[in-house]
Regions:
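Glycine-rich FAD pyrophosphate-binding loop
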Residues: 24-47
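Conserved Rossmann-like nucleotide-cofactor binding loop
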Residues: 15, 38, 167
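Extreme N-terminal leader/targeting segments of oxidoreductases
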Residues: 1-7, 25-26
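C-terminal helical "tail/cap" subdomain of flavin- and related membrane-associated enzymes
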Residues: 329-448
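Conserved N-terminal helical subregion
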Residues: 2-5, 55-196, 446-447
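Acidic/histidine metal-binding catalytic segments
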Residues: 73-77, 125, 264-279, 335-344, ...
Length: 448
């Protein structure tokens, strides 16, 4: 870079804060505008889910700019899922090989840490309480309003990044006004509500903290991730309305109490006052946002602004962080030629965003309907056995997505091939008895 370029990032969330560190380290002058107050000072939620799952793609992006160790201090490893059935029986399924884990992290703590790093180490300037009203995409001009004072501001930059979430103002107020801009927003039939399961009186955990807990119940499910303070953030995913079990049926304390007592009995014993805590968090919707192109002129979208997805693969934050990795690699590949960078970023990254959205929806059905199914568990055991014997021939789809940096689009396509192979394998006579036999392993090998 011949001269120091000025960059504006709209959104001081997880992706915006991390990208500010990348740009600052690359010699750019960075200013961030955030519509919310400073979450480090205000008594507000960091928005959306309290807990997130951090995996290899996220760590890759964090470690590349030397901030991974700061986040590891506040991360809890989860080596597998624990399924809770109606009678309280537990079934454990490891996520990957021995020693592999995903990490439960607090959205608020990660966000606050990233803001600190962006300001202190990245020399970024963050302006809070500023709403983005409009962006001149080609000329790099942003119009904002201070939502406390009403003051209107015009800011100019060499580059603008919209990292302002699924309901991005950059996208809505500017990108979506472009001719032939492709855009769709689809809400799924299910919503979610969070519940905080407190620690025991002595501060200890009520369940194994090193696992993601799932109560699969067919059309709906409850999950729980551990927090640092001994509590668990639990999330109930269920249809908004229709059917016997839906959020529109849980309109009284009596209904909530009876629902948990009947459907999640072991959870109810840990939190008999669930009905009193029910209203602590609002009922929220789940949306998938697809759009294209992700960049135009001097402006690009990142994270949820470009590819918001449902949370059922635990990859939303990881995908947003991977956007930083991809843009950083392109920045060096094209020697800071942003016209070339944006063109390749938009074209090459879009298929991965689409694939992740498809993977996330499909994994919802897996988590909801199949994780407690003996045939599904056997299928996963066979895959794990074959992968252990022939690691160069088979990496399970979950491991491709969670424990590697393989492109989402490549993983998705490989997963389809693997699924077809396993469908044939599961038709083997007496598969339950000889699942780990050489005969079964040879059959998979012949189909690969």
């Amino acid at each position: 870079m011949e001269e120091k370029k000025n960059v504006i990032i709209i959104g001081a969330g997880l992706v915006g804060s991390l990208w500010a560190v990348y740009l600052s380290k690359a010699g750019y002058s960075v200013t961030i505008y955030e519509r919310r107050p400073d979450i480090r000072k205000a008594e507000i939620s960091a928005g959306k889910s309290i807990n997130l799952a951090l995996s290899v793609r996220g760590w890759t992006a964090l470690d590349a700019v030397g901030v991974g160790d700061e986040i590891r201090k506040i991360a809890i490893p989860m080596s597998g899922r624990v399924m809770h059935d109606l009678t309280g029986n537990l079934t454990y399924q490891p996520y990957g090989k021995e020693g592999q884990a995903i990490f439960s992290v607090s959205r608020g703590k990660v966000n606050a840490t990233m803001m600190d790093i962006a300001e202190k180490h990245g020399n970024a300037i963050i302006h809070y309480n500023h709403d983005c009203r409009k962006v001149d995409l080609k000329n790099g001009i942003v119009w904002l309003t201070n939502n406390l004072t009403g003051e209107e501001i015009e800011a100019k930059a060499d580059l603008i990044f919209g990292a302002d979430g699924a309901f991005s103002a950059v996208r809505y107020n500017s990108m979506q006004k472009l001719d032939r801009f492709q855009y769709s927003q689809n809400f799924i039939a299910d919503g979610y509500r969070e519940i905080l399961l407190p620690a025991n009186a002595d501060g200890s955990y009520q369940m194994d903290k090193n696992a993601l807990h799932i109560w699969p119940r067919g059309r709906f499910m409850l999950i729980a991730l551990a927090n640092e303070d001994g509590s668990f953030t639990c999330t109930l995913f269920m249809p908004h309305e229709g059917g016997e079990n839906a959020f529109d049926k849980l309109t009284s304390k009596e209904a909530v109490d009876n629902f948990f007592k009947t459907i999640f009995p072991d959870f109810y014993t840990m939190m008999p006052n669930i009905a009193d805590a029910w209203e602590d968090h609002p009922l929220s919707a789940l949306a998938i946002v697809r759009c294209y192109p992700w960049a135009h002129g001097k402006t690009a979208l990142m994270g949820d602004a470009a590819h918001a997805t449902v949370p059922f693969y635990g990859q939303g934050m990881n995908a947003g962080f991977e956007d930083c990795t991809v843009l950083n690699n392109l920045m060096h590949k094209h020697n800071h030629d942003w016209e070339a960078i944006f063109a390749e970023y938009s074209k090459e990254r879009k298929p991965d965003g689409d694939a992740l959205q498809d993977l996330s929806l499909e994994n919802y059905y897996v988590m909801r309907d199949f994780v407690a199914d003996p045939a599904f568990l056997l299928r996963k055991k066979i895959e794990a056995k074959f992968s252990e014997m022939y690691p160069d021939k088979w990496l399970p789809l979950y491991s491709q997505v969670t424990f590697s940096n393989i492109r989402y689009s490549v993983a998705y396509n490989q997963g389809k091939v693997q699924s077809e192979i396993m469908d044939q394998v599961m038709e083997t006579p007496e598969i339950e008895q000889k699942w780990d036999s050489q005969e079964v392993m040879d059959k998979i090998l012949s189909l690969c």
